[in-house]
Structure formats: structure tokens, C-alpha cells
């Protein structure tokens, strides 16, 4: 989430996705106001730390001076497109994260569930990922070296773009991505609405996305290396640790890790969850 002025200038540092849990209070307030089932059926997603709507409400309550100056609420991709073309747009896949402001049944912004967050006019124009959002402006061309008038597509979230890059196009295709966090995408030909997962229209019309994600993955292995493998040179640590892990028997001799070291996203959606290691001698 990046609030920008009417001129397109950032008003604050961007707020991250599910790993940022600042809007827990606002999530509870919106669930009480609207009802969890109403939110799920209209938006396809439960309100969680992944949701942008509660974070906008947090901004409204905690940073009113910034909120009053907001021209648009953008995503990271929207901001890049805006800088290149002066157009404020967002793809439907990304917009589905704006629960409870995106209506999955009519593919549009909505304030039908609540009018307490922000006017829908201050949200970007909805388009499909592959549509042309605009063209590289003269100013952007001078700054980037791109040719003026180069067409710029709407784009999408990093994980969805990465999914396409490895061949996830149609129903039945799936990707699991390991990075700082873990993200999984399954493309389907019908909506799968489950409060334990995330839903979004897929990048291409007529298809749907069912997603899941863990809050810690690479960040956890880095933490382990820095705290428990200090004697190993950093440039060799992961190679050595991976080799040792490969020798572990099935079940790891009873060692169990609940990787909730930054709360957890799917399937428990609990920012207060804490990491636990069982079975240490």
C-alpha cells in the first residue's frame, strides 16, 4: 500500500503485505461492522494482515494529516506504471487484496460493505494485467532511457508474474515459490472460496487463482544461519546446512518446527502466532 498525492508523489513509506500486522485492531473492527461471512462472499477473502483495506483504515485513524492529502492508494506496480505513464491503474488480481473494497462477483471497487475506509474514487482504475495502461511519457523517457511512447502494460504482483514466467497459465497449473516468504498459486476454472486461503481473479479473464503463503521461509533460514551457524563462513553456510539436512531421516528424529516467527498467514491468519521448535535435545 502506497498513498500518493494528487500529483503522484509518495506521502509516506509503503506498507508491506501480510508480514506487516499493524492493522489487527482495524481488522477486528471491520469484521464486527460487516460480518465475516459477508466479507468472504463479497470479496472472496477473509480480512487478514494481507488485506489492504484495514491498512487504509489504520492510516485514516493514525495518520489523518497524510490521509487527507491522499490522491490515490497505489500498489508497488501501480506506482511504477504511474511514474512511467502518469496513469493510475491496478490489475484485478492485485485489487483482490484490497478487501473489503473489491467485489469479486462484479469485478469492481465497492463501498457497499463499508463507507468508513476511503472513497472508491481514490483507488486506481481497474484493468487486466495484459492491457496497455498508457505510454512512456517524455519525462519518464528522459529519466529511464526508454523511448517516448513505449506501451506499458498494467502489470501485476511479483508472485503472479513469476508464476507466468515458469508456465502457470491455465487451470491446473500450480507454482510454489520459495523466497523470504513462501507463496503458492493454483489456477482453477472456478472460484474456490475458503477463509483459510486467498482468492483472486487470475491474470487472464475467465480463470481464477487460489493462493496460500507462509510468512517466513528464507528469512527463517537466514535467522538460523546467523544465530546457530556462526562458526561456518557465510558464503558456504547454506551449502553445508543443506547437505546436513539432506542426511536427516524422514521425520527428522521427531524434530518439529512451527514456522510462525512473524505471525502466520495461511491457513491460520494469526499475527500473534509464535514460532516453536519441538524435539530439541
Task: Indicate where each model-derived feature is located.
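Active-site phosphate-binding/coordination module
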Residues: 1-56
Amino acid at each position: 500500500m502506497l498513498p500518493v498525492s494528487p500529483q503522484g508523489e509518495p506521502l509516506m513509506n509503503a506498507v508491506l503485505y501480510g508480514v506487516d500486522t499493524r492493522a489487527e485492531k482495524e481488522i477486528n473492527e471491520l469484521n464486527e461492522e460487516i460480518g465475516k461471512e459477508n466479507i468472504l462472499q463479497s470479496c472472496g477473502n477473509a480480512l487478514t494482515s494481507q488485506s489492504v483495506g484495514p491498512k487504509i483504515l489504520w492510516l485514516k485513524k493514525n495518520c489523518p494529516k497524510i490521509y487527507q492529502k491522499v490522491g490515490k492508494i497505489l500498489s508497488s506496480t501501480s506506482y511504477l506504471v504511474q511514474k512511467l505513464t502518469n496513469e493510475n491503474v491496478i490489475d484485478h488480481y492485485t485489487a483482490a487484496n484490497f478487501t473489503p473494497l473489491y467485489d469479486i462477483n462484479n469485478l469492481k471497487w465497492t463501498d457497499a460493505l463499508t463507507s468508513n475506509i476511503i472513497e472508491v474514487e481514490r483507488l486506481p482504475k481497474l484493468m487486466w494485467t495484459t492491457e496497455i495502461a498508457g505510454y512512456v511519457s517524455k519525462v519518464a523517457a528522459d529519466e529511464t532511457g526508454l523511448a517516448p511512447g513505449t506501451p506499458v502494460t498494467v502489470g501485476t504482483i511479483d508472485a503472479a508474474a513469476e508464476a507466468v514466467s515458469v508456465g502457470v497459465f491455465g487451470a491446473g497449473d500450480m507454482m510454489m515459490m520459495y523466497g523470504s516468504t513462501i507463496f503458492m498459486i493454483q489456477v482453477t476454472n472456478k472460484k474456490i472460496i475458503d477463509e483459510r486461503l486467498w482468492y483472486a481473479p487470475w491474470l487472464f479473464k475467465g480463470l481464477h487463482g487460489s493462493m496460500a503463503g507462509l510468512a517466513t521461509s528464507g528469512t527463517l533460514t537466514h535467522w538460523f544461519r546467523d544465530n546457530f551457524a556462526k562458526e561456518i563462513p557465510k558464503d558456504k553456510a547454506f551449502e553445508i546446512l543443506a547437505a546436513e539436512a539432506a542426511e536427516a531421516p524422514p521425520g527428522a528424529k521427531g524434530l518439529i518446527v512451527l514456522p510462525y516467527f512473524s505471525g502466520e498467514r495461511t491457513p491460520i491468519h494469526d499475527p500473534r502466532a509464535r514460532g516453536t521448535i519441538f524435539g530439541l535435545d
